[in-house]
Amino acid sequence: MTKRKFVRFGLTIAALALLVTASGHAWGYTHENRLTFSRPVALPGVVLPAGSYSFDVASPTALDVVVVRNARSGKVLYMGFTNTVTRPRAMSPNTPIAFGEATANEARPIAAWYEIGATLGHQFLYR
C-alpha cells in the first residue's frame, strides 16, 4: 500500500508541475512594444511609412530575432537577426528607439530597438 501511495503522490506532483508550467507560459512576459512613427523609418531592406507598428522578438527562445508587424493588420513587414546591445546610460528607459543618420531625402534608419524599461536592446544589422 505504501508503494501505491508513493506512486500516486509522485504522479500528482508531476501533474501539478505541468499545470504550473503551462499556466506560466500562458501568462508569460511579452517583449512586444507598439510604436508610432510620424515619418518614414528604415530597417534593413525595408522602409516603413509613417504609422503604428508592433516590435517583438520572434519567440522566447530566439531573443536575437526581431519581428516588426503592422499594428492594425498584424502583417509581418520585417524579420531579422539582431545583436544584443546595452542601452546607453544617457538614454531614458522610456525611449524605445535609437536612430542612425540619413540624408534629408532618406528615411532615418532604426539603429536599435530597446524594449521599454529594459537595459538591453536589439541592434539591427545593416549590410
Model-derived regions: residue spans:
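Mid-chain, structured segments of secreted extracytoplasmic proteins
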Residues: 68-115
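Short acidic, Pro/Gly- and aromatic-enriched capping/linker segments at domain boundaries
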Residues: 22-42
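N-terminal secretory signal peptides that target proteins for export/translocation
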Residues: 1-6
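A short tyrosine-centered beta-strand micro-motif
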Residues: 51-56
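Short, low-complexity, Pro/Ser/Thr/Gly-rich segments in the mature regions of secreted, periplasmic
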Residues: 117-126
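Bacterial N-terminal signal peptides
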Residues: 10-21
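Short aromatic-glycine-enriched beta-strand elements
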Residues: 62-66
